[in-house]
Amino acid sequence: MPGPRVWGKYLWRSPHSKGCPGAMWWLLLWGVLQACPTRGSVLLAQELPQQLTSPGYPEPYGKGQESSTDIKAPEGFAVRLVFQDFDLEPSQDCAGDSVTISFVGSDPSQFCGQQGSPLGRPPGQREFVSSGRSLRLTFRTQPSSENKTAHLHKGFLALYQTVAVNYSQPISEASRGSEAINAPGDNPAKVQNHCQEPYYQAAAAGALTCATPGTWKDRQDGEEVLQCMPVCGRPVTPIAQNQTTLGSSRAKLGNFPWQAFTSIHGRGGGALLGDRWILTAAHTIYPKDSVSLRKNQSVNVFLGHTAIDEMLKLGNHPVHRVVVHPDYRQNESHNFSGDIALLELQHSIPLGPNVLPVCLPDNETLYRSGLLGYVSGFGMEMGWLTTELKYSRLPVAPREACNAWLQKRQRPEVFSDNMFCVGDETQRHSVCQGDSGSVYVVWDNHAHHWVATGIVSWGIGCGEGYDFYTKVLSYVDWIKGVMNGKN
């Protein structure tokens, strides 16, 4: 508030060798290499995406090594691979460190460098889908006379999974699963499509036939594409709602799977909407009290854990664009109207028990006075920055009580209808600097899911009186418009 890594099951080391063989014939054969000989492994792709990384990622990779990984899919399926992070030392024609993707029916593709580097050839957002049921990734680094970690290149992180044969349309899809049900001689192949519950639900389901490349048909021969939509507001490990005490507690993994940790001008929070949007406060992007803002400030987003160090290990989710509500005025220090923003991520995020979106509100009853909700965040606590996700159970406060509290203190802050207040004047609470942008959630008894009704916006001091939140309901149409590409 202002002023106010599941790793894929793989091994890089060959099961036949625990170190560098000392035999002279091997040294003669591989004398050109400085390190261990080629290491190989075989991975079995599954419906859900799994991670494959360079050795030691995200720490800088060592020099003078070669690793080949064969990724195989079950009969009737292909392998899809896409890079989420790629950082190799650039070189002309990728003659130095490189990653090579190869499979039957296609020429090998070699990559190096980083996105935007003038030298090198990074893969960018390209996805690789094997023509058969296997794909090979080869990672090579050139020998070096320098310290093997004396460079700043961390390697790569890729996601791989199975897709149906003749797959031709991009998926974000952690979401879609396919189960082959064709018998010998069947043509075309029939695939029972389904969504990965409980993280996704189907908008169109059933047995679809892969008739032509990129076309699915149902039993009535009508074209239909399975749409898997993220399930919001239903944690696999929900918070225990029977607690009676107010105040701060440490969150368990999976309690608040929508929680994001942001680092822009400082630490902040946010909440996942769908599988590629972060809901946050505008003032975390354009602070009210900042005199010398740097242009092109980096926006870092982390998800998937309750410990900051573990979130950092999982890696930053690059942001494609930032959308701030037009009503937000950075130069009006006492007016936080329109304190809401959306961050669109470059890639959709595979959902799972520790990464799930929160729902949006749809009615005023979710704001009634006395309704208890939860606010979570990585903000300061007792003057110290926390490294663990904390949460507090707090009631929605009467609007008139908050107005009176502000007037008593002769505060100039605007308390508009697009805001609401939370807390109890007689109780201490823990919302403070670093919590900005995190959300206040309540349980919707009718829809049976958690709803983000508020965004931590502003307050007077820490742990005292009331805190003031952006009323998300007032901005639902704007949020949906941005997410649907209308705004």
Swiss-Prot record:
Span of domain Peptidase S1: 245-484
Any one GO molecular function term: serine-type endopeptidase activity
Keyword Metal-binding: no
Catalytic residues (UniProt): 283 (charge relay system), 339 (charge relay system), 436 (charge relay system)
UniProtKB keywords: Complement pathway, Disulfide bond, Glycoprotein, Hydrolase, Immunity, Innate immunity, Protease, Secreted, Serine protease, Signal, Sushi
Up-regulation conditions: Up-regulated in monocytes and dendritic cells (DC) undergoing maturation or activation.
Domain of life from the UniProt record: Eukaryota
The keyword Oxidoreductase belongs to this UniProt entry's keyword annotation: no
Expressing tissues: Highly expressed in placenta, liver, kidney, pancreas, moderately in lung, spleen, prostate, ovary, colon, and PBL, and weakly in heart, skeletal muscle, thymus, testis, and small intestine.
EC nos: 3.4.21.-
Positions of the CUB domain: 39-163
Result after altering residue 436 to A: Unable to cleave HP
Signal sequence annotation: 1-35
Cysteine pairings via disulfide bonds: 94-112, 195-228, 402-421, 432-462
Residue ranges of domain Sushi in the record: 165-230
Carbohydrate-modified residues: 147, 166, 242, 296, 363
Top EC category: hydrolase
Purpose: Mediates the proteolytic cleavage of HP/haptoglobin in the endoplasmic reticulum.
Family membership: Belongs to the peptidase S1 family.
Protein name: Complement C1r subcomponent-like protein
Gene (UniProt): C1RL
